[in-house]
């Protein structure tokens, strides 16, 4: 193979590598890989958070919520924020002193009218609600247990509305992982 042919092959390989990187970048920008804040799903570093007083566990993306941001305001737990401060996760548990059901808890504690909710699911054992405002999405889920000290196990997520599609999988995974410690 002469030098020109070697140069041509090298140029083709470099061009293919550059095009491959461009395609990956374009694909990532389009949200096709569900990137959140520039991270691929495997780089979200999922961890389990435990509220030991009540045995509440939640899987959360520590790669996003990397900054401990104080104790939970509504019970025993922790707040986490993203490094850029645009997203917030609060995990907490509180005693169900009033003996509320998910429906009665919402009725007594919801700070906005039900018409302001974009999503609402209420069952005998949990509620999940979501609303939007000021460019943000607020999502909350609380599981009610009578066998774990009559506790309410909750999480609140706040994240940019413009990134909803990228956040959908994260919200689903975090929400479904909320539970009392089994054992």
Feature map (PLM): residue ranges:
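Bacterial N-terminal signal peptides that target proteins for export
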Residues: 2-16
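C-terminal segment of classical bacterial N-terminal signal peptides
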Residues: 16-30
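Sec/Tat-exported extracytoplasmic proteins
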Residues: 53, 68, 84, 110, ...
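N-terminal low-complexity, Pro/Thr/Ser-rich intrinsically disordered segments
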Residues: 29-49
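Short, hydrophobic/aromatic-rich segments at coil-to-beta transitions
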Residues: 42-48, 73-78, 121-129
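Secretory pathway targeting signatures of secreted, lumenal, and periplasmic proteins
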Residues: 50-104, 132-133
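Surface-exposed amphipathic alpha-helical segments
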Residues: 64-65, 151-183
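Signature of long, low-cysteine stretches enriched in small and polar/charged residues
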Residues: 103-166
């Amino acid at each position: 193979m002469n030098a020109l042919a070697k140069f041509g092959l090298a140029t083709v390989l470099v061009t293919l590598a550059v095009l491959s990187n461009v395609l990956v970048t374009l694909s990532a920008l389009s949200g096709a890989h569900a990137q959140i804040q520039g991270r691929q799903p495997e780089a979200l570093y999922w961890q389990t958070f435990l509220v030991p007083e009540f045995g509440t566990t939640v899987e959360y993306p520590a790669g996003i919520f990397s900054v401990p941001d104080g104790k939970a305001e509504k019970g025993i737990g922790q707040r986490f924020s993203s490094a850029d401060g645009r997203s917030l996760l609060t995990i907490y548990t509180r005693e169900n002193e009033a003996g509320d059901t998910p429906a009665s808890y919402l009725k007594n504690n919801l700070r906005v009218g039900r018409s302001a909710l974009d999503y609402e699911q209420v069952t005998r054992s949990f509620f999940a609600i979501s609303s939007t405002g000021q460019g943000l999405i607020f999502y909350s889920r609380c599981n009610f247990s009578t066998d774990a000290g009559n506790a309410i196990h909750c999480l609140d997520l706040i994240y940019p509305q413009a990134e909803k599609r990228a956040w959908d999988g994260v919200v689903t995974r975090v929400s479904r992982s909320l539970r009392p410690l089994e054992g």
